[in-house]
């Protein structure tokens, strides 16, 4: 009995191919719509977050961070800059806190301009080593134009005044000497002689006082110029330097203890890890 044979075609029909293409296209469209929806929802959330009023907790936390965490970096109390290898910070006096450190160059400039040898706050006298520059390297004092003009006028007036006083004294002394000679001849000294003698004495005393005062002023200017043209090296205060060393050692001790603790933990963990390996090796040998 013969079975009816049906011819089965292995090639898919055109309708099946078009259906598959349509399904793949619809799937691609759905995936694209989903991805677009996610991308649109993400910026909308961002815009909502940006448009929403700022919470009060964020500024408080930021303020607490900035206010609670102190700055561990030391700064100079004159220029408010940090120290480095070229210009390190020193501790020349007993001041503490933000006034504890200062640059060597800043302190030298301040000492030259103020002409003082002690701290203006704690009144501690600086430990200094000074030496003068050579004369050819001396610098002028930092003065304004009005101060220089006053000094020049003062010097000119003093020179003229001293010349007049000396000339007047010379004339009076000469006339007095002539009258003394005449008195020796006649044996009588008239009243103009005593008047001139009193004037000479008063002029001479006034001239000495005037010279003393002016020499004192010029001596102060000379000291200022001398102090300005000296090389100063300020040393650390012994008490503050010892205190800084003690604080640094106290800070480094906990770190060393932590390192030792970590080392012990590592050693214990390694020993605990090696014990099972040894037992396993013994079991294998058995």
UniProtKB/Swiss-Prot annotation:
Zn(2+) 2 binds at residues 93, 95, 119, 122. One of its GO terms (molecular function) is MHC class II protein binding. Residues 25-36 have a biased composition (Basic and acidic residues). Residues 23-65, 260-279 are annotated as: Disordered. Pathway: Protein modification; protein ubiquitination. The chain crosses the membrane at residues 153-173, 193-213. Interacts with CD86. This is E3 ubiquitin-protein ligase MARCHF8. It comes from Mus musculus. The gene is Marchf8.
């Amino acid at each position: 009995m013969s079975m009816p044979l049906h011819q089965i075609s292995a090639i898919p029909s055109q309708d099946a191919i078009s259906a598959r293409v349509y399904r793949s296209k619809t799937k691609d469209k759905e995936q694209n719509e989903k991805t677009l929806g996610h991308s649109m929802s993400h910026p909308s959330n961002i815009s909502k977050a940006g448009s929403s009023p700022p919470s009060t907790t964020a500024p408080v936390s930021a303020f607490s961070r900035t206010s609670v965490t102190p700055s561990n970096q030391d700064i100079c109390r004159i220029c408010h800059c940090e120290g480095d290898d070229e210009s390190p910070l020193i501790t020349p006096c007993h001041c503490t806190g933000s006034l504890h450190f200062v640059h060597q160059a800043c302190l030298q400039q301040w000492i030259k301009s103020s002409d003082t040898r002690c701290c203006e706050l704690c009144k501690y006298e600086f430990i200094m080593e000074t030496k003068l520059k050579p004369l050819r390297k001396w610098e002028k004092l930092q003065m304004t134009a009005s101060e220089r003009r006053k000094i020049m006028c003062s010097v000119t007036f003093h020179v003229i005044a001293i010349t007049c006083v000396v000339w007047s004294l010379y004339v009076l002394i000469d006339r007095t000497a002539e009258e003394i000679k005449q008195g020796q001849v006649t044996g009588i000294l008239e009243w103009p002689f005593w008047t001139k003698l009193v004037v000479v004495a008063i002029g001479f005393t006034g001239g000495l006082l005037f010279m003393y005062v002016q020499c004192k002023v010029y001596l102060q200017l000379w000291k200022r110029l001398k102090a300005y043209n000296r090389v100063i090296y300020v040393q650390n205060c012994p008490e503050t330097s010892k205190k800084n060393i003690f604080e640094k050692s106290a800070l480094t001790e906990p770190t060393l203890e932590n390192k030792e603790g970590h080392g012990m933990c590592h050693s214990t963990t390694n020993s605990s890890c090696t014990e099972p390996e040894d037992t396993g090796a013994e079991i294998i040998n058995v």
